[in-house]
């Protein structure tokens, strides 16, 4: 258990979207019960109201004492109902879509849905909005030693990156126009941690079976964010005075090579959980990643999204960021590194019936 770091929220109400999701669920826990294993707890006399889509499992949110509003970011009526009576509140917007049924959903949800929410929140008198973005608006690093900063130019990769770029531009335009609501953008890369979706468990399974494809040398680097580290940064962005109107990268302390990520997952499975991990013979030439990138772009241009092709297109790319600004301005201090974070992730899978 980590030493507890309380973060005080001076607001009567916290509005939270994406609370039933992977990362949003950890933010929800930090706001309510706290995350003692990560040393994280939000202090203050505030209520938490979550916006969840129809059909989501809200049992855990109920246990945490949250107010529940059911609705869709694309429907202004439900968005207005969610922010009703929210004067002086803090909004933490985590909802979005990464792997859609079709490409059109990217902008409908990530871009227009966010604009709908921010517009309604401003009119309701919300004091500050913290909005989750991604590494995707800036694309891929030019080489493995390069790190993105908050000043890196936009160069989005495919539909998801474009939707997040358009979202960020709309938010920055609000800030430039003198928005009465403070707006903070936080960017997170590939994240990992408890409550993971099946796609992350499949990653573990492929590593265990020696079937995860390494494209190229495997020396390309990826920033990753353990979910509780990211939750810390999100709460700091919600409270720090100097965060208003700014953008921050949040991630683990340092990027990892793909070789290192796969090696650590294999070590955790074998050494910590006694699983047999097969050697990985799947090393494919860089041209496979290039071909996947072209195919992904072609399909998305036609409005088609294929998750496995899209993910494959990124596997030989460096996507790495510098968290110096978040450390200096927010006091962000990620406490959990790759080995411990992966151990906790696998432990959660084992305890929750996700088999490899």
UniProtKB/Swiss-Prot annotation:
What the entry lists under InterPro entries is as follows: Epimerase_deHydtase (IPR001509), NAD(P)-bd_dom_sf (IPR036291), NAD(P)-dependent_oxidoreduct (IPR051783)
The GO molecular function terms of this record are: aldehyde dehydrogenase (NAD+) activity
This protein's source sits in the domain of life called: Bacteria
Q: Name the SUPFAM superfamilies on file.
A: NAD(P)-binding Rossmann-fold domains (SSF51735)
Q: Provide the disulphide bond pattern.
A: none
Kindly list the GO CC terms recorded for this protein: cytoplasm
What cofactor does its activity depend on? NAD(+); NADP(+)
* Keyword terms: NAD, Plasmid
Report the Pfam families cross-referenced here: Epimerase (PF01370)
What exactly does this protein do? Answer: Putative nucleotide sugar epimerase/dehydrogenase.
The record's similarity note reads: Belongs to the NAD(P)-dependent epimerase/dehydratase family.
What is the protein named?
Answer: Uncharacterized protein y4nL
User: Which organism's genome codes for this protein?
Assistant: Sinorhizobium fredii (strain NBRC 101917 / NGR234)
Organism ancestry: Bacteria, Pseudomonadati, Pseudomonadota, Alphaproteobacteria, Hyphomicrobiales
């Amino acid at each position: 258990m980590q030493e507890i770091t309380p973060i005080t929220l001076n607001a009567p109400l916290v509005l939270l979207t994406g609370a039933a999701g992977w990362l949003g669920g950890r933010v929800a826990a930090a706001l309510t019960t706290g995350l003692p294993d990560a040393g994280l707890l939000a202090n203050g006399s505030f209520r938490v109201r979550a916006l969840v889509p129809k059909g989501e499992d809200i049992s855990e949110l109920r246990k945490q004492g949250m107010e529940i509003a059911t609705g869709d970011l694309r429907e202004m009526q439900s968005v207005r109902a969610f922010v009703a009576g929210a004067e002086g509140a803090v909004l933490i917007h985590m909802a979005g879509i990464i792997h859609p049924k079709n490409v059109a959903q990217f902008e409908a949800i990530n871009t227009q849905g966010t604009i709908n929410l921010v517009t309604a929140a401003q009119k309701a008198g919300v004091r500050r909005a913290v909005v989750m973005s991604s590494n995707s608006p800036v694309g891929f690093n030019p080489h493995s030693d390069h790190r993105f900063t908050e000043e890196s130019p936009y160069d989005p990769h495919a539909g998801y990156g474009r939707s997040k770029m358009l979202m960020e531009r709309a938010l920055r335009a609000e800030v430039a126009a003198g928005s009465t609501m403070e707006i903070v953008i936080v960017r997170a890369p590939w994240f990992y941690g408890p409550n993971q979706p099946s796609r992350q468990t499949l990653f573990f399974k492929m590593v265990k079976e020696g079937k995860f494809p390494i494209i190229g040398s495997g020396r390309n680097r990826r920033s990753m964010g353990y979910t509780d580290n990211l939750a810390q940064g999100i709460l700091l962005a919600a409270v720090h005075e100097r965060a208003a109107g700014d953008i921050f990268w949040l991630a683990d302390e340092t990027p990892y090579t793909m070789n290192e990520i796969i090696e650590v997952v294999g070590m955790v499975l074998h050494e910590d959980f006694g699983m047999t991990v097969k050697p990985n013979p799947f090393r494919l030439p860089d041209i496979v990643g290039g071909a996947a990138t072209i195919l992904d772009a072609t399909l998305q241009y036609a409005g088609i999204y294929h998750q496995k092709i899209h993910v494959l297109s990124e596997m030989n790319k460096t996507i790495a960021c510098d968290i110096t600004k978040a450390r200096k301005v927010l006091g962000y201090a990620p406490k959990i590194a790759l080995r411990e974070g992966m151990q906790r992730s696998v432990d959660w899978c084992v305890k929750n019936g996700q088999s490899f």
